[in-house]
Amino acid sequence: MKIAIDGMGGDNAPSAVVEGIVSALKEYSEMTFYITGPEDKISLELSKYDYPKDKIVIIDAKEVISTNEHPVMALRRKKDSSIVKALNLVKDGTCDGIISAGSTGAFLAGCTLIVGRIKGVERPALGPIMPGRRGNFMIVDAGANVDSKPEYLVQFSKMGSIYYKNVFNVDIPSVGLLNIGAEEEKGNDLTKATYKLLKEENTINFVGNIEPRYIPTGDTNIIVSDGFAGNTALKMYEGSAKNILGMIKDEVLKADFKSKIGVLLLKPFLKRIMKKFDYKEYGGAPFLGVNGICIKAHGSSDGKAFKNAIRQTKIFYENNVLDEIKKEFEKKN
């Protein structure tokens, strides 16, 4: 498998990118990586490590697209940017997939415009995997499409179900529609119309509306939503988890000696919980519906996060998720 990696994407690039790749090669020696970015900077970082030289290829790219640039305009203007060159490696078939921790807008727009949509897919969607109390769940769409149509949400449900089934080995993943109430008549025009379509769709295991407070249980495998509500729910969930863990730490610091002894006994359990909520463990979010394996890593990804994004890309590839999505949408054409 060959993976293109945006060497200048993210707050900690290129050092974290190189660290993640070198670490991944120790485990996945069969893989080859194409890093895009200024050759001198990438080479300098690589010189710090001992690695198989035939497994890493540097593709020189002089420009970088920043997060404050207009995504589409930047893609058109900066043809020599690290993200554009990485996307073109997937488009021309040199690489099987791409990972970037750079500008989300530029990445999603580039995946759609350069790599291209799968035939039959109206709108690609971002589908991060999140930890739940009783299992992982996917939110789709988590921000790629602020405005959506009911038909788009049905497609999001299908792509999310295919991903979840093949990656987590769940034969019939459950799909819930993010809404303000469980009743069918609740919500706005979009959710009401989507509910009717999902209920009639026999290829989806639709379990009805799901309120945000029930998402963290993990009982529902896929939470489908427009990108605005999905992104809001995702960020609220991430922020709540971070603040709850922060409150626990604050209380521990203020605790008396006996309480601190109790906390020490609970330390292994607390570490496991904290690990579940660490974005580094999940690597990135798959962008479903484009004609390539596209993984969006967190902007502040470190070496560990990049390694796990590579692992996630490998799982996507080995479980034939892309081919399965193509097969589903070929039926409709």
From Swiss-Prot:
InterPro entries: FA_synthesis, Phospholipid_synth_PlsX-like
Pfam families, sorted: FA_synthesis
GO molecular function, one term: phosphate:acyl-[acyl carrier protein] acyltransferase activity
Localization terms from the record: Cytoplasm
Protein name: Phosphate acyltransferase
GO cellular component, one term: cytoplasm
Keywords on record: Cytoplasm, Lipid biosynthesis, Lipid metabolism, Phospholipid biosynthesis, Phospholipid metabolism, Transferase
Single Gene Ontology BP annotation: fatty acid biosynthetic process
